[in-house]
């Protein structure tokens, strides 16, 4: 099955991600996942009987749960998941990196150096 990622959030407290995935038939799910890969808006997931491909490459994506998409549920996640990169994906310096469970920031931000 072919899924297009329409929106994504990361949760620094749990080290997991949430993405809105839409199928060709416009079935939408919110996927809560763990893995070494961050699903950016525009990413494509292909699920076959044997493997999961992310943008055409084999990927290690562990789906924790899939929720039926509703705007209310997605808005609730966006409101309560507190990651500066979710609001500013071009963030360069993050003042919360020391509290984050991600070894590397999914958005590429660095921790501010002590002065």
Regions found by a protein language model. Give the residues of each.
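Short, structured beta-strand/loop micro-motifs enriched in basic residues and often containing a Trp
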Residues: 21-31
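Short aromatic-glycine-enriched beta-strand elements
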Residues: 15-20
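Structural detector for short beta-strands of small beta-barrel domains
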Residues: 1-14
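Short nucleic-acid-contacting surface segments enriched for D/E, G, S/T with interspersed K/R
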Residues: 33-49
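Short, Lys/Arg- and Gly-enriched loop/turn segments at beta-strand edges
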Residues: 50-62
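Glycine- and charge-enriched low-complexity intrinsically disordered segments
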Residues: 59-115
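Short capping micro-motif at the N-terminus of alpha-helices
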Residues: 31, 47, 61-63
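Residue-level signature for short turns and capping positions that connect secondary-structure elements
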Residues: 25-26, 36, 52
């Amino acid at each position: 099955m072919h899924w297009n990622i329409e929106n994504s959030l990361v949760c620094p407290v749990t080290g997991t991600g949430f993405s809105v995935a839409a199928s060709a038939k416009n079935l939408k799910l919110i996927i809560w996942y763990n893995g070494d890969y961050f699903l950016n808006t525009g990413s494509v997931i292909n699920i076959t009987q044997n493997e999961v491909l992310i943008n055409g490459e084999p990927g290690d994506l562990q789906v924790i749960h899939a929720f039926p998409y509703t705007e209310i549920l997605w808005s609730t996640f966006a409101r309560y998941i507190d990651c500066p990169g979710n609001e500013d994906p071009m963030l360069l310096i993050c003042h919360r990196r020391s509290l984050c469970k991600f070894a590397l920031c999914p958005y590429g931000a660095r921790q501010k150096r002590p002065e």
